[in-house]
Amino acid sequence: MTRQCPPQESGAALSGSVLAEAAVVFAVVLSIHAAVWDRYSWCAVALAVQAFYVQYKWDRLLQQGNAVFQFRMSANSGLLPASMVMPLLGLVMKERCQTAGNPYFERFGIVVAATGMAVALFSSVLALGITRPVPTNTCAISGLAGGVIIYIMRHSLSVGEVIEVLEVLLIFVYLNMILLYLLPRCFTPGEALLVLGGISFVLNQLIKRSLTESQGDPVDFFLLVVVVGMVLMGVFFSTLFVFMDSGTWASSIFFHLMTCVLGLGVVLPWLHWLIRRNPLLWLLQFLFYTETRIYLLAYWSLLASVACLVVLYQNAKRSSSESKKHRAPTITRKYFHFIVVATYIPGIIFDRPLLYVAATVCLAVFIFLEYVRYFRIKPLGHTLRSLLSLFLDERDSGPLILTHIYLLLGMSLPIWLIPRPCTQKDSLEGARALVPYAGVLAVGVGDTVASIFGSTMGEIRWPGTKKTFEGTMTSIFAQIISVALILIFDSGVDLNYSYAWILGSISTVSLLEAYTTQIDNLLLPLYLLILLMA
């Protein structure tokens, strides 16, 4: 996040910040490797080494403008931190499920790790293939690491699991070609790897479960169908509006009609097929099942109203000011972080399944409103463009505004990714008890405090970056205080004397926040989740 110290622009400074970011990522990789210590963790180490070398090739391609697609230019490629998320997440999921004696989800964790390695290797091969002259040494390192990974995975995965990994890789390749063409400057290569890799895996899981008629928790199917449905809707309308003007009333009416058709004719029947009941009735019964849920929904509605009032108030201030290019200051943008923290903490403490579903619904609403804004759909399209432009920052350089969606994802992914079948009564012991709070700690508290204190009182900059030492230290301190408050108010959290690991995890992720130029709302919670679950 921004801290208002002038950044250094020299190539040496940039290289230093990239090296520091890489050092933090390697510290995480080696920590997980030491905790797991099997052939899969050795694969993760090999992947990190090759991603470190290939990352510089991506950076050079971006600087020279020779990348295949138009990527976000205000950051480095971010290949190394993004490449390690899915593999490390799969490794820690495998360990937890192996300890819990759940062989099915243990294998699922291995598939997640293998899939993450496959898409990361593809991104590396893409960079090496378009680099001129061909980087012989980097190709040798990448080929050696890739050969080791493929050899180990070939002798570890079943034929069905190999096919599943290849299916995800195929979907990932097609999504890259489609979405990176339709959405220029919205992603760095690392962000594209992380976001599109996750979407590809979700899409493949939904197809697999639909074809096999597998049984599962309806809330999991609800998340899968909503994510895939919204992505397919975006691809459909992006393709359609290439041939017609989306800003007319006729196009807007057609947009709303087709949204209803896709929702009622595709998404709802698909969900009905998976959960074997009426989706709308199930959702209503689920939301109003207990009095606690009714109170939480009322409380969240109040917070949503407050967020809307903040947006309207800030835009009213802009209208009355002399400069129409006025942008909200850092502290104003952090209001939404405070609101999100106030939203998630009661949900985590009192009713996590409700929070799981509510976050899914909120994600669908956010994406739909972004479609309305992006396509200028009447009657709200132009209004949303005006209201949200106030809160843009340097990361919103493409046609889409994704910061608020990344914030929601960063807070929700720790809730969605908990391996519930591998936990005892949906609870974890030790540092793992804080896994649901990973988004709250890393983004809601840590990133917010770091940004506010760094921009107002920060003087000592970390080398090669505009982030400040004071901001990072206050971030760590605020997260420690938050952990203490969680212990007081959440009786289900038992840290079991794992305080040193928690402090190390928080400090490591705070250092990553100081050096990364990627979307920290998404990256930081995932790394904290991985460390806490290890």
Swiss-Prot record:
Listed GO biological process terms: dolichol metabolic process; dolichol phosphate mannose biosynthetic process; dolichyl monophosphate biosynthetic process; protein mannosylation; protein N-linked glycosylation
Location of the protein in the cell: Endoplasmic reticulum membrane
Reactions this protein catalyses: a di-trans,poly-cis-dolichol + CTP = a di-trans,poly-cis-dolichyl phosphate + CDP + H(+)
Coiled-coil residue windows: none
All ranges on the Cytoplasmic side of the membrane: 1-16, 94-109, 154-161, 208-220, 274-293, 351-355, 419-432, 490-491
Residues in the Extracellular compartment per record: 38-72, 131-132, 183-186, 242-252, 315-333, 377-397, 454-468, 513-534
Gene Ontology molecular function: any one: dolichol kinase activity
Protein's name in the database: Dolichol kinase
